[in-house]
């Protein structure tokens, strides 16, 4: 292939890639009273089959796309970089080290069972537990969650993770030091309750 032809071909591929990557998909704003189709179905061209649908085991965008479609975490990050409430309707912190999250009322699992703060505690403890062998076991430690690193390294029990349920709808997370990125880090797919 001639250098000029190769350059044009490469530029064409790059342009096509940029155009594909820049198209955003957004959920529709459906006005109240709108009659929806009887069958609600999401079809996603994901490129390949997922290796796992366990949020603590996934490692690729293929799985992350599906996890994001199926699960919600405490917060999400908008395309503009703003923290948005998801399972948590509000939160406050003391000295940027003790964070209290108040779960939205009425959040439920697919079987209708309420999602509680204890479900989140159990999920995060499972994430850091070396027995789970999660590729993201070190993530809570990176977030500066109390005992996260020691648990992932097998030095402490998962139950010592700095997260506790105050009641069914209130979660408290204790950090070892302030972390300016903490709220944004909560949007990671490995932190969704399971």
Identify the meaning behind each predicted range.
Residues 41-45, 100-102, 162-164, 172-174:
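Soluble periplasmic/extracytoplasmic beta-strand elements of cell-envelope proteins
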Residues 89-139, 172:
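Aromatic- and charge-enriched surface segment that lines or borders ligand/interaction sites
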Residues 45-95:
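N-terminal lobe/hinge region of extracytoplasmic solute-binding protein
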Residues 119-121, 128, 132-194:
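Surface-exposed binding/hinge segments that line
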Residues 30-43, 168:
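Immediate post-signal peptide segment of exported/extracytoplasmic ligand-binding proteins
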Residues 2-26:
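Gram-negative bacterial Sec-dependent N-terminal signal peptides
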Residues 65-69, 82, 86, 98, ...:
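Extracytoplasmic/secreted proteins, especially bacterial periplasmic and envelope-associated proteins
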Residues 56-58, 103-111, 159-161:
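Second-shell loop/turn segments in exported
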């Amino acid at each position: 292939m001639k250098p000029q032809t190769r350059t044009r071909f490469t530029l064409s591929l790059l342009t096509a890639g940029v155009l594909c990557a820049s198209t955003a998909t957004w959920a529709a704003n459906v006005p109240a009273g709108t009659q929806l189709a009887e069958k609600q179905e999401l079809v996603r061209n994901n490129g390949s089959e997922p290796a796992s649908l366990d949020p603590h085991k996934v490692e690729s965008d293929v799985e992350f796309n599906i996890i994001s479609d199926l699960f919600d975490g405490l917060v999400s990050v908008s395309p503009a970089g703003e923290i948005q409430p998801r399972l948590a309707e509000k939160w406050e912190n003391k000295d940027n080290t003790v964070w209290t999250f108040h779960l939205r009322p009425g959040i439920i699992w697919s079987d209708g069972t309420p999602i509680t703060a204890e479900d989140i505690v159990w999920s995060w403890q499972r994430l850091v537990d070396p027995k789970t062998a999660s590729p993201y076991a070190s993530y809570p430690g990176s977030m500066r969650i109390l005992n996260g690193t020691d648990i992932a390294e097998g030095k402490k029990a998962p139950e010592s993770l700095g997260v506790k349920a105050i009641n069914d709808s209130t979660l408290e997370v204790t950090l070892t030091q302030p972390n300016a990125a903490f709220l944004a880090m909560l949007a990671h797919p490995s932190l969704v309750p399971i």
